[in-house]
Amino acid sequence: MKLDSIDSFVVGNPNPGIGGRYFIFIKLTTQCGISGYGEIYNASFGPHLVAAMAEEVFAQEMAGEDPFQIEKIWRRVYSRGFSQRPDITLMGVLSGLEIACWDIIGKATGQPVYNLLGGKLHHRLRSYSYLYPPEDAEAETFYADPDASAEIAARYIEEGFTAVKFDPAGAYTILDPHMPALEDI
């Protein structure tokens, strides 16, 4: 089995971009037609540039390789630069590519990926929701209003969630896209 192609998908998130401004997904396909999907995290650059980075890494380091050889691929990609210490964006790209390889391996062997990674640890997982403002609310005022937050938290409990996650400083995605200054927080 050999890796044959990569497709990338940049999915935007409507303003104010709560939960992230965009997501970058990739699809790797083998010569025998098995596809695996991965997500690239922690992109320091624009999403289309990061997707192009994934396509370049695939073309230079992974095309024609056996997806079962994750350690070999990982070490080669990790050691690409002269410093052999990649930046955080390349690590996000590598993570997405590795996830897609694990997906391919799981499909090829008929196993859930968790079995390949050591087995199931929990039979149930607690689900929580981030504390998002309602669609008709202004995000900046929502995060400053504890009563509005409590109302949404109660609604999530009614939906079956047993916990909510929130940032006491509010979501950074409601601010300008520059690095927030202390006064912004």
Mark where each language-model region is.
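N-terminal amphipathic alpha-helix/helix-capping segment at the start of soluble metabolic enzymes
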Residues: 1-6, 107, 111-125
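Structured beta-strand/loop patches that form or line metal/cofactor-binding pockets in enzymes
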Residues: 1-44
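Short Gly/Pro-enriched turn/cap motifs at secondary-structure boundaries
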Residues: 14-18, 89, 158
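Short coil/turn motifs at beta-sheet boundaries
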Residues: 19-21, 92, 120
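Broad gene-expression machinery/nucleic-acid interaction feature
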Residues: 23-25, 96, 126, 163
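Metal- or metallocofactor-binding catalytic centers and their adjacent structured scaffolds
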Residues: 29-109
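Short alpha-helical segments and helix-capping/turn motifs at coil-helix boundaries
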Residues: 100, 112-113, 149-152
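Metal-dependent enolase-superfamily TIM-barrel catalytic cores that perform enediolate-based chemistry
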Residues: 124, 129-185
